[in-house]
Amino acid sequence: MNVGDLKSANDLYESVRSIEGVTGVHLFRIRDAGILKSTMIPELDALTTISLDELNKSPTVFTKNLLQGCGGTDLDVPAELKRLVIFVCNILESCNEFTDLGSARLLRLTFDSCQLVIMYDSLFVVAITKDET
């Protein structure tokens, strides 16, 4: 990882923090960048895989509480976030409802009156929680 990557990620972090309605921004460095490559998604058993059915039945699975206290660029990826990233990758495998941001990808998940926005590339995950207005 070079300093430019960290600087651009931090710039992104600072810019989205000031958007109205944003209730949390969480920046994570991915130590195992391979986890974000669809061909390298680890095989998981049913207990650790989060399905769309689960999300529909329990729309609070991915609330900001999942990510609180985990912010920073120097932490290992928490197990819960790994599950979330894998879940996002699984969605991307089954549909094309994401926006191409150059080398990054964007996915929005909406639940209740809140949105969880996941942006990721090979080095970072930025998770943003935003109240819908």
Swiss-Prot record:
One GO cellular component, as annotated: cytosol
In which broad location class does this protein mainly occur, judging by the first location in its UniProt entry?
cytoplasm
Keywords for this entry? Cytoplasm, Meiosis, Nucleus
GO biological process per UniProt: meiotic cell cycle
Subcellular localization: Cytoplasm; Nucleus
This protein's source sits in the domain of life called Eukaryota
Question: What is this protein's function per UniProt?
Answer: Has a role in meiosis.
Name under which the protein is recorded:
Meiotically up-regulated gene 15 protein
